[in-house]
């Protein structure tokens, strides 16, 4: 009979507990079995934290790190659950004998629980008929229980102790594979719920007590050994907060933000609850601002709550969790302490309630969404924020406004920059503050952003980088209550001059500029556009005589091909390139140019750039010390080949006798602007001695056609219309004519005006400005026998200058209405009035 029991228990274990790939506990156990197989059959490798009795089936991560929660571990080899050693044999070749639940408690070493089961008269129940799951506290768990609680249980074994043990039991067999994450299982004491959590790292907890020895099969159930004694729970998180004096500040904040009631509902929450001491650490102004802002206070409260139940024993390393606020926090461990965002702050852990678990912390967690934009800066942006505060810009960032900070890292500020005149430094900082809130996902290539200083900054988006002007972003963008912050590698320098102006300003580029102008390409670099120009310094032309330069200039096609190979459409910032890989661009000449960013240096056709990212209003300049030449373009002229070979030694220039350079059309990059001006409408409202005049100003419709640069050939004799950039200037005039309104339409009009009797009639004229305005007003205040003016055209003036001068000299110009005269614009109305 005895040999049959081990065989029977092995068969039963295989039937009721097959390995399930979706069962995290079994999966980790299988890994531990594999790591221990060199020690013999059915041996599992465990990691034990040095200086403690805590043991874990190892995960891959912890196994190779040789640490858990930052503490070193040692490897133990033990029999896997359900097996035992035999004297003289390697490994664990025998299965444990099977017994009823009471007997199994002794087999697994839970002798204190076994003794208490006997004392409370529970033994008869768990030896008899039925099927039970017993979460049995280990002997160490009983030793760690509060002494007063333990004495209370021992003094009333028939009621208190029995009830406590029943609260550790389920009236059916449930193996670890059956214990699903988030389950609430009624216990055998008043159906009080047992909260089950089954974590991806293989940890299984019951009311936050970890199963340290699971799946010990019994004839009438199963025993799981746990690392602590379960306490009865019946209150919610809300109930605990309302009853706990040390959470009065948190309670007040939760009530203000309408969060407290939500913590009384069903769920599986984790609350990191700041104590009163934690709130006292906050600057009063910060706390008052947040609590006075409903959105910010709600965000603050929700940032302390997870929608999952995270027991301390489940945390074996850093992991990121999403809060109810929407942002994430990192929960980790350092020895026996829980860390939040890398900081030890948990004073008391694993306060289990009927809808979650509470960890008390000594710091208030403030999410970015509750912070002012200046508070979003981290340790690497303190130079920027300190300067913003010192120069008075921080006070200008109103809590009710919205801004974006483009914050350079600390090492972007050189000693020369910091020693600048404060007025100049303030202007530089203003270039790093935008008037609006712009998140990272709202930025796009070609976007124009306006700073609080009135400067316009351009956005460039590349495969692996986002840049604004000359500086590219680093990771760390955040959004706060009244703005966003983006981190930049360098100080942003807005462009002030065009490509041509930059070349003209810098004497290093005088030779290249003279060749560019000789090739009739000056206009290209003065027009608005987006270009990348690779500019050779004068050193690139050392050794070239004036005669050789003249030869080069005489062959305009060759010169244009060479110059345009240095120019490519689009703005490409050096730091915007993906490091270490070749970026291929097509030049305006048509051939390809190869760029690579290596060790913060831009390589152009494998030549090191001497200086990069010189920003201009219509592009960017990268400086090289060699003349560039397209390797796929042959030369067919001996003289030209000799000159080029003299200047270019890093490639072998092809020579094909008789070959000529292709003609490249002179290109103009323009932005088309169509401006439509609608004539003003004039309305007359009668019924008073003084006419009521309503003037509707000109309507301006501005259409901007965006897209790729337009290239076209300028033919000889063709008229080129220059687009003038900037806002059109519209002069506004008001015409007032007293008398009877006469509507002018597009048809033949005949009208005679006869003035009889002593009645004085005159036409009142008002203009929108001009040097004769005051004199004209004076004239109209004097007695005038008769003034008649027919309005022709639509220029907005009643009289020409010469007519006004004659009028001032005493002449009275009179013009008769002419037949067959069509008035321009069917919507024009003439207003005449009469004044006596």
Curated annotation (Swiss-Prot):
One of its GO terms (biological process) is cellular response to fibroblast growth factor stimulus. Coiled coil: none annotated. Widely expressed with highest levels in aorta, stomach, lower gastrointestinal tract, placenta, uterus, thyroid tissue and breast. Expressed in the kidney. Expressed in the lung. Up-regulated in epithelial ovarian tumors. Not expressed in normal ovaries. Also highly expressed at the tumor periphery of lung carcinoma tissue but not within the tumor. Overexpressed in breast cancers. SMART domains: FAS1. Its main location: Golgi. Keywords: Cell adhesion, Disulfide bond, Extracellular matrix, Gamma-carboxyglutamic acid, Glycoprotein, Golgi apparatus, Heparin-binding, Repeat, Secreted, Signal. GO terms for cellular component: collagen-containing extracellular matrix; extracellular matrix; extracellular space; neuromuscular junction; trans-Golgi network. GO terms for molecular function: cell adhesion molecule binding; heparin binding; metal ion binding. Glycans are attached at residue 599. Disulfide bonds join 44-80, 69-333, 79-92, 208-311, 467-472. The keyword Transcription does not apply. The modification S-cysteinyl cysteine is found at residue 60. The keyword NAD does not apply. Residues 40-94 form the EMI domain. Residues 97-230, 234-365, 368-492, 496-628 form the FAS1 domain. Gamma-carboxylation is controversial. Gamma-carboxyglutamated; gamma-carboxyglutamate residues are formed by vitamin K dependent carboxylation; this may be required for calcium binding. According to a more recent report, does not contain vitamin K-dependent gamma-carboxyglutamate residues. It is found in: Golgi apparatus; Secreted; Secreted, Extracellular space, Extracellular matrix. Residues 1-21 form the signal peptide. SUPFAM superfamilies: FAS1 domain. Induces cell attachment and spreading and plays a role in cell adhesion. Enhances incorporation of BMP1 in the fibronectin matrix of connective tissues, and subsequent proteolytic activation of lysyl oxidase LOX. Homodimer. Interacts with BMP1 and fibronectin. This is Periostin. It comes from Homo sapiens (Human).
